[in-house]
């Protein structure tokens, strides 16, 4: 979890244009993901002005300032240019008013821009800051992208998680993280997992050591991060434990405030775990699209029992 994001990093990661204040990019930081679009502030009402937020100007805001005199624009911009304001951000590649550039220069505030529409730019910056500023936790497991689904493979040490991930990579799927997965909540329904920088693209295989998946299999075999859609827990087979054979039992595991579907796969000699997990991901996708093989089987079984009962009567 980062406490803040510098304007320099924001410009680099989101490929923003710098109109002015390039010398202040490193020192200016933002600590909130919320963005402010000035409204009443442009009329001179500054009660509850969120000076600590990025100030976003779109077509509406810029055109409104054009109806002011130069003196009025300069006065308003100077009041908005608090020393704690991270930056002024302008959408649609609009030309910033001269008074904005002057007030920003006086207060050491960068003026940034983008060719995106105001709504898209707002969403892009908010999502980016949410990801950078979100609380992070570490989980033990392996995260793999299987057919576009983020599958977190968990289980006791030595159960075969990394070996299974290696087989999945050979089958064309993509590795995100091995051994340690850093997770954060992106929104109310989404949890994202990524690898720590030092472990990125690396996989540890007992007896072989550490391998670099990207160098061995190419850039298409790895991803930086992915949302976690399914948890597959590998558990050593036990005769004393009952396992779900129909897939009717639904489990969930809470990660932050998000319930993530979970299935338990018993590990036994001779079972191809990579194929099992691959099929589990495909089956999960089918269920999310409205087809449930278990419910179909139960419905057909019910019809058969009902038909046999009618024949006996």
UniProtKB/Swiss-Prot annotation:
Q: Which Gene Ontology biological process is one annotated for this entry?
A: regulation of carbohydrate metabolic process
Name the InterPro entries on file. Answer: HPr(Ser)_kin/Pase, Hpr_kin/Pase_C, Hpr_kin/Pase_Hpr_N, P-loop_NTPase, Ser_kin/Pase_Hpr-like_N_sf
- One of its Pfam families is Hpr_kinase_C
Q: Which cofactor does it need?
A: Mg(2+)
Q: Which cysteines link up through disulfide bonds?
A: none
Q: Which UniProt keywords apply?
A: ATP-binding, Carbohydrate metabolism, Kinase, Magnesium, Metal-binding, Multifunctional enzyme, Nucleotide-binding, Serine/threonine-protein kinase, Transferase
Which catalysed reactions does the entry list for this protein? [HPr protein]-L-serine + ATP = [HPr protein]-O-phospho-L-serine + ADP + H(+); [HPr protein]-O-phospho-L-serine + phosphate + H(+) = [HPr protein]-L-serine + diphosphate
Which EC main class describes this enzyme?
transferase
Chain residue ranges for the region called Important for the catalytic mechanism of both phosphorylation and dephosphorylation: 203-212
Q: Which residues bind Mg(2+)?
A: 162, 204
Q: What is its EC number?
A: 2.7.11.-, 2.7.4.-
Organism's domain of life?
A: Bacteria
Give the Gene Ontology MF terms in alphabetical order.
ATP binding; magnesium ion binding; phosphorelay sensor kinase activity; protein serine/threonine kinase activity; protein serine/threonine/tyrosine kinase activity
Q: Where is the active site?
A: 140, 161, 179 (proton acceptor), 245
Renumbered to this chain, region (Important for the catalytic mechanism of dephosphorylation) spans 266-271
Q: Which Gene3D superfamilies match?
A: HprK N-terminal domain-like, P-loop containing nucleotide triphosphate hydrolases
The family classification in the record reads: Belongs to the HPrK/P family.
Q: What does this protein do?
A: Catalyzes the ATP- as well as the pyrophosphate-dependent phosphorylation of a specific serine residue in HPr, a phosphocarrier protein of the phosphoenolpyruvate-dependent sugar phosphotransferase system (PTS). HprK/P also catalyzes the pyrophosphate-producing, inorganic phosphate-dependent dephosphorylation (phosphorolysis) of seryl-phosphorylated HPr (P-Ser-HPr).
- Domain text from the record? The Walker A ATP-binding motif also binds Pi and PPi.
Miscellaneous comment: Both phosphorylation and phosphorolysis are carried out by the same active site and suggest a common mechanism for both reactions.
**Known partners and oligomeric status:** Homohexamer.
Can you say what this protein is called?
Answer: HPr kinase/phosphorylase
Q: What is the lineage of its organism?
A: Bacteria, Bacillati, Bacillota, Bacilli, Lactobacillales
């Amino acid at each position: 979890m980062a406490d803040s994001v510098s304007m320099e990093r924001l410009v680099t990661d989101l490929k923003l244009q710098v109109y002015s204040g390039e010398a202040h990019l490193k020192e200016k930081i933002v600590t909130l993901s919320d963005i402010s679009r000035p409204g009443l502030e442009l009329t001179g009402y500054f009660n509850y002005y969120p000076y600590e937020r990025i100030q976003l100007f779109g077509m509406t805001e810029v055109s409104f300032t054009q109806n002011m005199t130069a003196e009025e624009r300069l006065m308003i911009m100077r009041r908005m240019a608090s020393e704690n304001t991270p930056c002024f951000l302008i959408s649609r590649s609009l030309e910033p008013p001269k008074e904005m550039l002057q007030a920003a220069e006086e207060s050491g505030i960068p003026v940034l821009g983008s060719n995106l529409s105001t709504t898209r730019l707002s969403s892009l910056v908010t999502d980016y800051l949410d990801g950078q500023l979100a609380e992070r936790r570490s989980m033990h497991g392996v995260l793999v992208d299987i057919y576009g689904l983020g599958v977190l493979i968990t289980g006791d040490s030595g159960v075969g998680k990394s070996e299974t991930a290696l087989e999945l990579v050979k089958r064309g799927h993509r590795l995100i993280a091995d051994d340690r997965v850093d997770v954060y909540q992106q929104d109310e329904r989404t949890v994202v997992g990524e690898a720590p920088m030092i472990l990125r693209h690396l996989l540890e295989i007992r007896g072989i050591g550490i391998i670099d998946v990207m160098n061995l299999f190419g850039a298409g075999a790895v991803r930086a991060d992915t949302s976690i859609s399914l948890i597959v827990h590998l558990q050593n087979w036990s005769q004393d434990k009952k396992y779900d054979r129909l897939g009717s039992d639904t489990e969930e595991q809470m990660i932050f405030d998000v319930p993530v579907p979970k299935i338990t796969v018993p590990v036994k000699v001779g079972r191809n775990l990579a194929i099992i997990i691959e099929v589990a991901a495909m089956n999960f996708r089918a269920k999310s699209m409205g087809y449930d093989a278990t419910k179909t089987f139960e419905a057909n079984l019910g019809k058969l029992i009902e038909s046999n009962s009618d024949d006996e009567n």
